[in-house]
């Protein structure tokens, strides 16, 4: 981690040094810059070439090369390249038409990676994610009949749960309660539309099964969440990263 921080700092300092040197270079005179590109030809802010009777080479009224009234190359009235009346590059209304197009939004790779690691986000469920498939737990319900019924029908019960990120809940009980409700609701609605109905015994057993899976999902997500926070804390507390952040603040303030 420390070696990575040192490499990042060295790369950033090198880049900023090159940018700083580029910014400090004097700008040469040219089109629309106020200075002259060639020494000894006019005062700063003047024409690139000495005027001849108010115009440029062969122009009576300040036009460009072969223009009577201030046009560009081959334009009679101040147009751009190939435009008769103030057009830009192949645009009748100026150059801003083609340069102000909105750029395509960039995909936030960090969010995509986080969603892939946590689970697939389910559309239409308000931010719920679908966990990975689990083995249904072997449960006992207090009597032989229910135990046998469960073993014979457990394949009809969910093996995945719906949940939201753990940081949206204050404790495990709230997470599990919400997880159980949305999972059973989605499973029963989806399965009922296929022609299968659930009895009260089925619902009772589903609640037990889904509760166990939601507890497992909470433990998994909670561990991943705290591991991520701890890794971030270690990264930002390393000396190279602290030095890099201080250097960035110095550049911004300075």
Swiss-Prot record:
Cu(2+) 4 binds at residues 85-87. Cu(2+) 1 binds at residues 61-63. SMART domains: PRP. Residues 1-28 form the signal peptide. Residues 23-38 are annotated as: Interaction with ADGRG6. A lipid is attached at residue 231 (GPI-anchor amidated serine). SUPFAM superfamilies: Prion-like. Glycans are attached at residues 181, 197. It is a lipid-anchor; GPI-anchor. Residues 232-254 form a propeptide. Cu(2+) 2 binds at residues 69-71. Keywords: Amyloid, Cell membrane, Copper, Disulfide bond, Glycoprotein, Golgi apparatus, GPI-anchor, Lipoprotein, Membrane, Metal-binding, Prion, Repeat, Signal, Zinc. It is found in: Cell membrane; Golgi apparatus. Residues 51-91 are annotated as: 5 X 8 AA tandem repeats of P-H-G-G-G-W-G-Q. Cu(2+) 3 binds at residues 77-79. GO terms for biological process: cellular response to amyloid-beta; cellular response to copper ion; cellular response to xenobiotic stimulus; intracellular signal transduction; learning or memory; negative regulation of activated T cell proliferation; negative regulation of amyloid precursor protein catabolic process; negative regulation of amyloid-beta formation. Belongs to the prion family. The normal, monomeric form has a mainly alpha-helical structure. The disease-associated, protease-resistant form forms amyloid fibrils containing a cross-beta spine, formed by a steric zipper of superposed beta-strands. Disease mutations may favor intermolecular contacts via short beta strands, and may thereby trigger oligomerization. Contains an N-terminal region composed of octamer repeats. At low copper concentrations, the sidechains of His residues from three or four repeats contribute to the binding of a single copper ion. Alternatively, a copper ion can be bound by interaction with the sidechain and backbone amide nitrogen of a single His residue. The observed copper binding stoichiometry suggests that two repeat regions cooperate to stabilize the binding of a single copper ion. At higher copper concentrations, each octamer can bind one copper ion by interactions with the His sidechain and Gly backbone atoms. This is Major prion protein.
